[in-house]
Amino acid sequence: MLPLSLLKTAQGHPMLVELKNGETYNGHLVNCDTWMNIHLREVICTSKDGDRFWRMPECYIRGNTIKYLRVPDEVIDKVQEEKTRTDRKPPGVGRGRGRGVDDGGARGRGRGTSMGKMGGNRGAGRGRG
């Protein structure tokens, strides 16, 4: 399970964020990006020593200052369910056209077929001689 997929699933859920400097932030996750920057709403910030508290309507936390995240167990279960659901798909389903197997049709965009070299030089190109 990748951390960013876990955070995307945790949107709207409460979570605890501890920073490297010891401060903790409790709030509801609004959004996160690929650098793990986090936007929280209804936040309670606790100081490093735990004796001061601040209530904020929202806050933004830079990803490289985060020490760890605590998300509810229901979010982790939800991510695992989604992973097992996608793992059960038959191979090739929902994966685009792909290369597939040889069906005897045209194969790519090259300079022609092997018959062009064996038979007379018909078609494009100047040829030799």
Curated annotation (Swiss-Prot):
Protein name: Sm-like protein LSM4
GO molecular function (one): RNA binding
Keyword S-adenosyl-L-methionine: no
SMART domains: Sm (SM00651)
Protein species of origin: Arabidopsis thaliana
Gene ablation phenotype (knockout): Severe developmental retardation leading to plant death.
Compositional bias segments (type: Basic and acidic residues): 79-90
Free-text function comment from the UniProt entry: Component of LSM protein complexes, which are involved in RNA processing. Component of the cytoplasmic LSM1-LSM7 complex which is involved in mRNA degradation by promoting decapping and leading to accurate 5'-3' mRNA decay. The cytoplasmic LSM1-LSM7 complex regulates developmental gene expression by the decapping of specific development-related transcripts. Component of the nuclear LSM2-LSM8 complex which is involved splicing nuclear mRNAs.
Limits of the Sm domain: 2-75
Subunit structure: Component of the heptameric LSM1-LSM7 complex that forms a seven-membered ring structure with a donut shape. The LSM subunits are arranged in the order LSM1, LSM2, LSM3, LSM6, LSM5, LSM7 and LSM4. LSM4 subunit interacts only with its two neighboring subunits, LSM1A or LSM1B and LSM7. Component of the heptameric LSM2-LSM8 complex that forms a seven-membered ring structure with a donut shape. The LSM subunits are arranged in the order LSM8, LSM2, LSM3, LSM6, LSM5, LSM7 and LSM4. LSM4 subunit interacts only with its two neighboring subunits, LSM8 and LSM7.
Xref: PROSITE patterns: SM
